[in-house]
A protein has these predicted regions:
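A short beta-loop-beta micro-motif enriched in histidine and acidic residues
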Residues: 1, 13-28
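Double-stranded beta-helix
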Residues: 1-4, 61-90
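Conserved hydrophobic/aromatic beta-strand scaffold that supports enzyme active sites
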Residues: 5-7, 26, 51-53, 75-76
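Short acidic-glycine-tyrosine-enriched beta hairpin
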Residues: 10, 40-57
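Short, solvent-exposed loop/turn elements at domain surfaces
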Residues: 15-19, 37, 84-86
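Short beta-strand His + acidic residue motifs that chelate non-heme Fe in jelly-roll/DSBH
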Residues: 18, 36-37, 60-67
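Extracellular/periplasmic catalytic domains that process cell-envelope and extracellular macromolecules
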Residues: 20, 28, 45, 65-70
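Glycine- and acidic-residue-biased ligand/ion/polar-headgroup-sensing regions
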Residues: 22-40, 48-50
């Protein structure tokens, strides 16, 4: 297994379309405001210091809620060595 920490920055209005992760993922916001939406659930807005757990296989999308400020967050994931941590939806 590998423990990965991804440091991600979205420009104002930036987004990641629907996708899923093959393992548990925890998102932690460092700067800005982001909206995460799991399929079939209401959207959740996260601000600095807040986190969200996403279960394996849960289809979701996330975006920067601001049109003027960047969104910066950490993504914590444990995967099998060599395994992709994100699978896009087609």
């Amino acid at each position: 297994k590998e423990f990965r920490v991804l440091h991600t920055t979205y420009a104002p209005g930036g987004q990641n379309p629907k996708h899923y992760h093959p393992s548990h993922v925890v998102f932690y916001v460092l700067e800005g405001s982001g909206v995460w939406q799991e399929e079939g659930k209401d959207p959740v807005t996260l601000k600095p210091g807040e986190s969200l757990h996403v279960r394996p296989g849960m289809v979701h999308a996330h975006r920067n809620a601001s049109t003027t400020e960047q969104l910066v967050f950490l993504e914590f994931v444990i995967v099998d060595k060599g395994q992709r941590s994100t699978v896009p939806m087609r």
